[in-house]
A protein has these predicted regions:
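Short beta-strand and adjoining strand-loop segment in the mid-core
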Residues: 101-103, 162-165
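Amphipathic alpha-helical interaction/coupling elements
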Residues: 131, 160, 177-178
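A short acidic, helix-capping loop that chelates divalent metal ions and anchors anionic groups
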Residues: 36-40, 164-165, 195
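Conserved nucleotide-sugar donor-binding
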Residues: 150-164, 201
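Conserved alpha/beta core of the MobA/IspD/sugar-nucleotide pyrophosphorylase nucleotidyltransferase superfamily
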Residues: 3-4, 9-23, 167-212
Length: 212
């Protein structure tokens, strides 16, 4: 049953039990874009890629899947030695939906849910991910962070939603069309972060998240 956007839900534990085995939500970091406005792929900006992986892992996500595309070899090199699953989106230039589909396909079948976030959210930290996960990480979970009421990331996608998201993801809309129909539970996180995606070098430098 869909929840209205204003629904409140009671926190639950991050870990869930499936078939008698304690499992964790997977992390899914989308980092495939060319970053045309930034002038470089965002996966290569400062420590954003490594930080995104570390945030998900520190919040209890395992495994962490990273979807790469532009500057593939350079981005892979930044993650050498880290316990991540790297997935290459061959069609990354088609828009956000292509890396999202690639990432969902790379998720382990036994994961109850995936925590999806973007590489260009450098002030979204571990506490934000943990807060959103407090509201569940089960196969039916559909939860999204908001910032002063504005929907953002991370988004917790329960496994039951993955086929529908893949089917609905086209162009640059990602999971937007699916989330508009299903209406996730919303978790306010503006006291922890801005949730602002950084698109321009001047923005990154002005807020201290790129040391050019």
């Amino acid at each position: 049953m869909n929840r209205p956007a204003s629904a409140s839900v009671m926190p639950t534990a991050i870990r869930t039990v499936a078939g008698g085995v304690t499992t964790s939500p997977a992390g899914l970091l989308l980092a495939a874009g060319a970053g045309r406005r930034m002038g470089t792929p965002k996966a290569l900006v400062d420590d954003w890629l490594v930080r995104g992986v570390d945030v998900l892992a520190a919040a209890g996500c395992s495994p962490v899947v990273v979807v790469l595309g532009a500057a593939l070899q350079k981005a892979r090199a930044l993650l050498q030695g880290r316990a991540v699953i790297m997935a290459a989106a061959a069609d990354w230039s088609d828009g956000l939906s292509a890396p999202l589909r690639t990432g969902i396909d790379a998720l382990p079948a036994g994961a109850p849910a995936a925590v999806v976030t973007l590489v260009d959210l450098p002030d979204v930290g571990e506490r934000v991910v943990r807060r959103v996960l407090e509201y569940g990480a089960r196969p039916a979970t559909l939860t999204r962070a908001t910032y002063h009421g504005r929907p953002g990331h991370p988004v917790v996608l329960g496994r039951a939603h993955w086929p529908g998201i893949i089917a609905a993801a086209n162009g640059d809309v990602g999971a937007r069309a699916y989330l508009a129909r299903q209406v996730p539970a919303l978790v306010e996180c503006a006291d922890l972060a801005s949730g602002r995606d950084i698109d321009w070098p001047e923005e990154a430098i002005s807020v201290g998240v790129w040391h050019a």
